[in-house]
């Protein structure tokens, strides 16, 4: 398999090129989305899950992460605590970013016209709720 050699400071890294068919990569990503979302539903009991970012747009690559927006009533006050709580519960084989909002926070941000959340609603895929 061919790859590219990169030097960062004094350490040399070899980055293998992904030589798999796009359909195979897409199927692996879809399986991981289903795996993670089913775990979130079973273990975290959210009101809603929205997939957003490159995976929702069908543009994910092997280097992409998965982005999930989750709405849940009973979550810790601080955002970092919410992410920590969720991250402990979910087994995954790919990089994942979670955004967790309480329903009232979600509604308030939408009413304020939050452009990022509007984009998530426009381009994201509702997986649950």
Predicted regions and their residues:
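Catalytic core of pol beta-like nucleotidyltransferases
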Residues: 2-48, 56-63, 72-129
């Amino acid at each position: 398999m061919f790859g590219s050699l990169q030097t960062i400071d004094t350490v040399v890294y070899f980055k293998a090129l992904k030589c798999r068919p796009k359909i195979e990569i897409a199927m692996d990503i879809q399986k991981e989305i289903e795996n993670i979302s089913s775990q979130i539903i079973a273990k975290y009991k959210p009101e809603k899950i929205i997939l957003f970012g490159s995976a929702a747009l069908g543009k994910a690559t092997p280097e992409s992460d998965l982005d999930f927006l989750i709405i849940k009533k009973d979550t810790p006050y601080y955002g970092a605590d919410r992410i920590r709580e969720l991250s402990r519960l979910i087994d995954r084989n790919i990089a994942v970013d979670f955004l967790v909002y309480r329903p009232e926070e979600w509604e308030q941000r939408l009413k304020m016209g939050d452009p990022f959340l509007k984009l998530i609603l426009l381009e994201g895929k509702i997986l649950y709720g």
